Amino acid sequence: MVSAEADKAINMFRTAKAEAQSLTTVDEFRVWYERFTGQFDVPEDAVVEQVGVGGVTAEWVSAPGASENKAVLYLHGGGYMIGSTRTHRLPMFYLSKASGARVLVLDFRSAPEHPFPASDRGRFRS
């Protein structure tokens, strides 16, 4: 038998999938993705520090006990079109917790406004 929490999550993802399938533009999908990921709060003990790295906006995300001497560089997914440091804070918190390291996530430029190789240049500069 599925728990109440699992049933709620399954229904939430079914609804999200149905909503996403009706979207036709990158802007619509970005708004939907921000709203969807905004449902998931980062724990209160997460440390989020906004920084600039090589001209690119970035965030350090750390779980309690993360070593200052260990770091993970994370390039978020999203097909170079969606996603940001904000949309990936929660997974980065859990990556920090599992690895014992701080996680640096870059907020690189996205297409179609910044076509290839703009996002790669920002990542390599960082």
Write out the residue ranges for each language-model feature.
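Catalytic nucleophile-loop/oxyanion-hole region of alpha/beta-hydrolase
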Residues: 85, 91, 104-126
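Glycine/threonine-rich flexible loop motifs
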Residues: 80-86
